Structure formats: C-alpha cells, structure tokens
Amino acid sequence: CFYEIVDDYLRLFHDKEGRIMYDQMSDMRNRYIDMDGRMTFGTVGGYAVQSRGDGGYYVKSRGDGGYPVQGRGDTGYSSQTRSDDACLGQGRGEVDTGMSYDASTGVCTDINRGDMSSDINSGLYSGGRMDDSCHTSESRRMDDPCGTDESRRLDVPCHSDDHYRSDNPCTDDSCQAEDRRGGHSDSHRIDISSEESASRRSRNHAFAEGRMSEMRLRYMETCRRVLPFMERTLEMQHGGDTFFCGDEMMLCDMMCYCALENPLMENASFFGQYPKLMALRERVASQINISQYIKRRYQSDF
C-alpha cells in the first residue's frame, strides 16, 4: 500500500526528484521479490523445498492432506506426526529425512541417531480409542514424534476436588469463613488500594512543596547576587538622576518590574537597601499604558 500511495502522490504533484527516488525504491523492491521467488525451487513428492543458502534445503510442507513437515534435508529431521500410521520422510519414498519405519514392528528409527521410539500401535495412531487420562495424545506427540515410548510416558494423576481442598489451604472451610468475615473480601482490597493512592498523593504533595520551597530559596539567593549590580547600573545612568529616561515604556523597564515582583511579595522590606530599584518599580507602575494591567495582574507562582 505504501508504494501505491507514493505513486499517487508523485502523479498528482509531479515531483521529479521524488519520482526518481520512487523508481529506485521500486526497482529495489522488485529485486527483493525476485530473490524471494528464487529461494523456493519447486516441490519434491508433495513437499515444498526451499534453499537455505548454505548448500542445504528446508522441507516446508506437504500437499497430500497429511500433517505439515518441517525438516532439514542435510543434517537431520524435525517432523510432526501423521494420522495414517506412517512417519513422514523415509518409508513414503519422497524425501530422505534420515528416518526408517518398520511397519511390522511399528518402530520408527533414525539412521543417524539410532532407535528413537517404539510401539506406535498402542492406540494413538491405529484408530483405537484413547484412554481417559489427564494428558492428551497431543502432548505425547510433542514428546515423541514417531510414536510413544513407554519409558518416557509420564502419567499425571487425576485428583478429585477433595484432594485439592485438603492440599490447598485457601480452599478449605476456614479460608472460606475468613472470606465471609471480610479477611480477603473485595472491600478489603479496595480499602488497601485507596490507602495506597492517598499515601502516594501525600508523598507527591510533600515533594511538590519541598520543590517549591527550594525554588523560592534559590530565587531569593539569585536576587541577592543580581540586585546590587542592577542598583549600581541605575546609579551610573546620568548620575542616577534620570535613569531609563523617556516617557515611553521600555522593554527593560517591564522586565525589571517582573523580576522584582515576586521577591517583593515574599519580603516587603527586601528592597530597603535598593532605593533606585524601588523608584524604578514605582515609575513602571505609574505608566498609563500598563498601570491597569498591573492592577488586574495576579501573583504568578514559580
């Protein structure tokens, strides 16, 4: 879909450079498609055989109604069971997977690895009825792909409800009685969750308050270092008599006013030692163009 969208876009806007890039991407895409097509080189006896690039090949699947097989034609096999009493691979005459099947004894043997299984006629694949046990034939097939090895079979005992009630302490009558009393009730869990939420909010609030106090202290310390320099600068302007001359409001006036607002609200006597700064603040506040705004303005937090 990406290539179709880009193609429509380039056709609509006539982007020459984009068209060149799109053609290059299309050529690369076609080359990858051709490479993928050459990877699969046909079927052998109903199997789709695909090359691996290292001299071997993969046997991917069958097309005759049997179960799919995934195998390696060079070093070994990896086979699933079939429902027609035959191990896939050797014995059907299609692809040599290193397996040998004896129909008289029901033994499926790996030539490279030796005898892997025995007795596949125990009812799993001969059409007989499965015994009513806790484990299924699917789990046996996963353990032994060519049959069932009696020595490897693990029968999982089926326990009744009384067995689990006696072993599990949370299923006996005492635990149920505790549930009725509210020991593990939903309301108890809700109370715990609400308490945890309240505790988390309290911690966050305390952290925010501590952070705010830290920022205020840092700001006040910055003012203690910067304001003396600002005071000396105002005294240098025309001998300190006409600093920031002019009737129009200047940007530096407004910046100075905003910089002095919060520390003055924190401590009214903070500017007692900076008379020029206090005079500047009063001058800014008395400007006609900005006085109404200053009166409406509320204290901004950090």
From Swiss-Prot:
A GO molecular-function descriptor: structural constituent of eye lens
Bias (Basic and acidic residues): 129-166, 177-192
Region (Disordered): 68-92, 118-205
Signal peptide range: none
Annotated segments matching region 4 X approximate tandem repeats of G-G-Y-[AYP]-V-[QK]-[SG]-R-G-D: 45-84
Chain span(s) of sequence motif Cell attachment site: 52-54, 62-64, 72-74, 113-115
Keywords (A to Z) from UniProt: Eye lens protein, Repeat
Placement of Sequence repeats on the sequence: 45-54, 55-64, 65-74, 75-84
InterPro entries: Glutathione-S-Trfase_C-like, Glutathione-S-Trfase_C_sf, GST_C, S-crystallin
CDD domains with a match to the protein in the record: GST_C_Sigma_like
PROSITE patterns for this protein: GST_CTER (PS50405)
Transmembrane segments: none
Superkingdom per UniProt: Eukaryota
Occurrences of domain GST C-terminal (ranges): 183-302
Entry function: S-crystallins are structural components of squids and octopi eye lens.
Family, similarity comment: Belongs to the GST superfamily.
Record's protein name: S-crystallin SL4
Originating organism: Nototodarus sloanii
